[in-house]
Amino acid sequence: MLDVLADSGPLGALFNRRDKFHTLAIEFFRAHGASLRCHTTWAVITEIMYFLDFSAAAQGDFLEWLYEGHTRGLMRIATIEPSDLPGLAAMVRKYADRPMDLADASLVWLANKTDITNIISVDRADFAIYRTSKRKSFRNLFPV
């Protein structure tokens, strides 16, 4: 089982047929889904729910899929504590020229916490720039 950080793009694309990455996301998870353990955050989940706001059915399907993945041990959801906020604020300031949103900051925070640097994201440019606190780069496994 390969541990990966999961960003909103590939996960949200699974549930939006109009998303330009929908077919790629379907193919990626068909080929690799059973061998991946995805780690994400509530900030990423919130972003996905916003992206799927065009359809309560799509939002419900996503939440059920998330729950199923969690119960099967294929999806882990990390919770940011109030004590983590100063570190997130420092990251947002550090990458102000990008700019870094909370979902991205939460994934870098999670990488720092877990030492996982494999990621699936459609945001290749930003995750090519971001570094962990140990100065490790991210390896994007999503083929965009």
Segments predicted by a language model, with ranges:
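Alpha-helix/helix-capping structural signal
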Residues: 9-10, 43, 83, 125
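Acidic, PIN/NYN-like endoribonuclease modules and their adjacent C-terminal/linker elements
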Residues: 1, 108, 112-144
